[in-house]
Amino acid sequence: MHTGEYSELLIGINGHMKKITLKLKNNLEEDQYSNCVKYGWIEKRCGKNQSFSSWKRMWFILKDSKLTYYIKEKNLKKRSSTIGSTQEFFKQQHGIDNNNCTNSNSNNNNNNSDLIHLSAPSLSSSTSSTISPISSSSSLTTTTTTTTTTTNANTNNGLSDSINHVYLEGELGKKKEGKGWKVRWMKLLEHSLVYYKSSKDKEPLGIVNLNECQDCEVNKESSNKFVVVHSSNRYYFKTNTKQELTQWVKSVKSRIPSINQTKMDLDQFQLKGVIEFNSIQQIAETFKFNSQPNCLTITTDEKAYYLSFDSNKDKLDWLNQLNLTINKFKGGFNSGGGSNNSSPSSLQSQQAKESGNGGSLSPNILGNFKSSIKPWRFSSSPSQGRVSIGGGGDRSSTQVKFVDNPLSKSSNKEEFDGGEYGSQILPRKSTIIGPNGGVKVSTSGAVELSPVLISSNNNNNNTISSSGNSIPTCLSDLINESSDNEDGDDLKMMIPESLKNEMMRRSAISSLKNFKLEIFIWSNHQEVFTFLFSDSVLVDQVKAFAFKKIPSLANLSVLDYRLGIDEDTLLEVEFLKFIYSHTMVELALKTCGIVKIGIFHHRKDRRVKEKLYSDKFYGHLLSQSPDGRKGNGVGIGGNGIPIEYSRSEPNLQSCLSSSPSTRETMVPSSPSSHQLITPPPSLKQYEQQLSSSSSSSSQQLQLQLQQQEQEQLLQEQPEAEQSQPEPQPQLEPESEIEIEELEQPIEELLNISTTPISIRSNSILSSSTSASSSPSSTPSLTPVIERQQKMSAAGWHSVNPSVTLNQRRQLISGCPGWNIEVSNPTSTFTSQGFKPKFDKQEHGFYRRYNFDGTSTVQSFLGVDMKMGPLAFSLAKDANDNYRGVLHTKHGAKTISEDSKNIVGILNLLSLSKKVKTKKVVSHLIGLLDPSIDAKLLNLASNQSELQKELLSFEERQTTSGFKFGMVYCRHGQVTDDEIFSNKQGSPEWDEFLSLIGDKIELVGWPHYSAGLDVKFNSTGTHSLYTDYHGNEVMFHVSTMLPFSTTDYQQIERKRQVGNDICVVIFNDGTLSYMPNTITSQFNHVIILVQYDKQNNGYKVSMACKDGVKSPFEPLSPNNLIKKSDIKDFILTKLINGELASLQAPVFASKITRTRESLLNYYISQFL
């Protein structure tokens, strides 16, 4: 059985045994408060090893021989704040029966003098006459009043009618932690604090159970705020005056049991732990936790307990009581040679002198206890240990001899130095490969792990050692860790020594397990390497060894690559053991003992580019290893990482012998998208295979290839062209030509199915073959061969099959998540008579009819169940027409209606002005949206302020400033790093910029800046700007943004362009562009522009992300766009593209939430 299985077994056994022991101990004690000296709420630091710990509030009971602490039962359901549960809570807390409620006017009149109403108006005017101060908490609990109100026959249905104990009520500001301030009507009851929306409401919004509260205190001395600390939250309240604040704090405090030290009902608690007095070695004051200034440390034989108190007074009270109780239990305590009758204060001063740090006094040391009574131990061999006195790293320490418990971790005896968790971040230490396969993790406080456990004959206690050094074993550490429960209690379960020894022996044998790992590198010439690793190896060790031993990875950066099951599932957490790094890895190792892992770049966009442009990124992987190693080999098993490895390469003979159905090919799924699988071997491999064969067979094979190419070409040409010889164009040596897509006859001859690809080759056939060809092969030289020779003369080079070569004539190549706009073959674009149409809402309602005109605007607010918050404004213009605008979370709608038509339809002549306005509003809203009920709208208050808010709200939705990206791409650039590294563009690029806008200087620029720095030139000195039909447009030009000589990724340039919704790519080459080249969540529209030198015009194509409604005006034409027309086309396309993108789900949801929150704010303020 594996070591991990033993540890899980031990953890389960210890956990169950501990729970059973504590429950038995709790049940056997019929009265938990018997022999009780002191009890109260104390915060205890909990967590394994107390390194990643939290503070939990527990109920402590100090008895004459031990200190026990309890915690609330976890299976108790928390009370909800709903109305149903609120009623049940009132029935439980106050014994109320709704069916037996009685209404007594006499009780209300007689007891009205004892009821305290803290309403804001009454307090400000006559506070002294309405407030009757409460002298003490006892008077509040004993002098309760019965107050009921006269209600109708439906009294039994109202919850507020069931409240018969109200001690304090008034209007307060209320705020939950993490929420905003709200005005609520508060009522203080016997055991709860109830809050309503207003004083007239009968159903409460929620209840704060004071029995579950821990404290009530003034938040800040200079403010009128106080906080009620609940077990699950914090409630902040705000009063109008200091007198109200004092009254509320005093009254609430008197009803919190934890403050008044009322005995808690332990039926709702479970025993969490016990601290026996005979195991306590010292009690000290500690100041290592910044957030807990009043702390004590109780150090026992096995661990240290950290307790935090609410105040220094509580801490001193508990210290004195602990000292007296332990002194009484042990008949006097040791204080380092002091007298047993020393008081705590004298003992404190005496030990402060002995334990001063650098001559300074340490008044925190209060006692050091030692008893001859020791609990039962597993081992009889003594050991030395050091116990920290004072609980801090700067305290002096004294050695105390005690018998060690093998089930307790040594790290528990000394608390980590460095203060409270979260105050500092411990740096990750390097992992060192140890001898015999051992992995020593050099982390502070960690135990050295050894996957190969060797039994030592020199140790009688069957401990485990590695390389002669006695260190704790993996299993024993896991056993020790299993003994530390959530709060690290000192109750350890008893495991027989024989069972422990047997587990140690078996784990030493089973720890020699290993697993087989296949590492593949994605490329056209895919290689797979097989290694045998120990099961204790980490993910980063596997990756580092792969980069060290695989020759093709020698020149790559280890930090830029990750191991992964596939390109979408990477092993990002590299400090884990490899066998536990992912669920699929664990499953594969459990089922077959082998797993296949690839090496991928950590950036997703780079992985996509490596797939599509494998010839560029993986060209260096085609080289063979320096030592020519093939097949299986022996790794570096001596240092414990891999044991053996093997390497497999593609074999031509296996490709020839396999059937077409078994070979993986590249199959296109659609004209714009391709499903990429393992490609076939390249032509270079076939050339090497052909050259190694006999000369006669090589000549025969080449003749067959030439004949088959000629036949294929003749089949594709029309019959008219077959009768006439094809004209041969005159080519310049340095010119580039585009060739038609040709089939690869060599693949057909080898019975391998591929897609048509474009080939550029310096030498299609090997030189040795062409030189030794027979004379009979000379007349069979076809136009295909001649065309290949011309390509070689023109400088075309051989590349691996690539998807982009199939789409050379397309400006934009397809990729997942993007849609390419299909150009209209019959449409043309010209700027003559062109009037741009923008798909944006041009309202200007409030600016036109209220602030810039003389019309009277009335605004109405309301909430619809389906549409949410609504705002409708009505105005009557100079032409006696009614105009209205309806704002919802989905946008704004406007309407205009002639008043004569409305009067005739609604018969408004005999109606009053108020009724007439309601009918007009109802009529207009029915025309805008019939599903909205106009009766839900009410006339808002403070119309002038609301009109200003609605004007601002309208201007937010009306976009007048646009920012777009403008990027220059040279010929052959395929990655974003290359594109953003262009310091300057070509003359065609500069001409294109001058056609689109004006080059402006940023310093002191007074108009729309699009986030560019106009004061200090931190984002460049110049930019491109234009004002197009009232729309200010600023471009983020890639060559004008700051260039960094040290940052090869040009993060500043990517940040500016990556935040633009629409981007223009000026492609100064012939390669097609992929829309996902620049990785950004904001880029939704890509417009590619390519200059045609021969026709002196621009080719334009557009692609947009999924979710963007397309097409939008103007449509991309099939022909060229003239230079004089390019500005109108590009700017109109960009503006409409951004407006369409804002309707995409990723933007629309955010805009909808913003509108809804603003409308809700207007309703809360003006309705």
Curated annotation (Swiss-Prot):
Region ranges (Disordered): 95-160, 335-361, 376-400, 645-734
Q: Does the keyword NAD apply?
A: no
> Domain of life here?
Eukaryota
| Domain named Rap-GAP: residues | 950-1162
Q: Where is the composition biased (Polar residues)?
A: 648-676
The record's listing under Pfam families reads: PH (PF00169), Rap_GAP (PF02145)
What keywords are annotated for this sequence in UniProt? GTPase activation, Repeat
Q: What positions does the domain PH occupy?
A: 35-140, 165-257
- For the keyword Repeat, the answer is yes
**Which Gene Ontology molecular-function terms are recorded?**
GTPase activator activity; phosphatidylinositol-3,4,5-trisphosphate binding; phosphatidylinositol-3,4-bisphosphate binding
Q: Which PANTHER family match?
A: GTPASE-ACTIVATING RAP_RAN-GAP DOMAIN-LIKE PROTEIN 3 (PTHR15711:SF62), RAP GTPASE-ACTIVATING PROTEIN (PTHR15711)
In terms of SUPFAM superfamilies, this protein maps to: PH domain-like, Rap/Ran-GAP
Gene3D superfamilies, from UniProt? Pleckstrin-homology domain (PH domain)/Phosphotyrosine-binding domain (PTB), Rap/Ran-GAP
Where do Low complexity bias regions lie? 98-155, 340-351, 687-732
InterPro entries assigned? PH-like_dom_sf, PH_domain, Rap/Ran-GAP_sf, Rap/Ran_GAP_dom, Rap1_Ran_GAP
Q: Name one GO biological process term.
A: regulation of small GTPase mediated signal transduction
The name on file for this protein is PH and Rap-GAP domain-containing protein DDB_G0271806
GO annotations of cellular component type? cell cortex; cell leading edge; cell trailing edge; macropinocytic cup; macropinosome; plasma membrane; pseudopodium
